[in-house]
Amino acid sequence: MKQFDKHADAYHAVRGKVAYPDVVFETIASRVPGREAALDIGCGNGVSTYRLQPLFDYVEGSDFGASLIDKARQTYPGITFGVSPAEDYTSTRQFDAVTCATAFYWMDRDAVLRKMETLLKPSGVFCAYKYDFPIAYGPLRDFFERELSLKWYVHRDPRLTRYDDTLERIHASKVFGEAERVVLSNIIELTPREVAMFFLSTSYVTKYMDQAGGAEYADELLRKVAEIENAPSVKVNFDIHSFFAKR
């Protein structure tokens, strides 16, 4: 879309700021019995995979998108990457940890969980995690909630809006001995413009613009945000919702 060309640098900058916090990877490392090997499924361009490198002797990543894996290989040459759907992924080794960042809900979750019988070592840990819907504190909160309810909501994928039954599926898989849902606090400070840019970079706002709002909606949203909030920075809640399961 044209707005991505017009605001490309800003989109990339804000996505770079909304990174997974260290506590995610520290929590993963604290729960695994060993640090020999980790696998990141649905790894995209490797931005979540490389965070595992300081914690494990060997790190591997997989994604079904060949172009994403090409980018990951160029950016992180010290990591082994493979092109494959997570449901079909095979490796020559077993892993102490298998992780999945903001991608598990797009997969056949039951098939992936069954796959953990072969990918995980005995007592190995599977962790799927994702951002919650961001909440901007202050006057922008009401504004973005209105935009969501009146314009964006119908364009969100149902997998993002319905109850997340991952924990129940983990228990039903009979692969794991224990499992729990863990919420990790994650507050990020962004400028009001960066908050708007984050939403404009999401799939649901992009779909709204394609189908209803038009390309001019980006500038309109930025203008309204500037009128509503003149503070230099805004605290935004990007809490991480994670599921841990141990074999």
Where in the sequence are the language-model features?
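Conserved catalytic/acceptor-binding region of the Class I
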Residues: E117, S123-I188
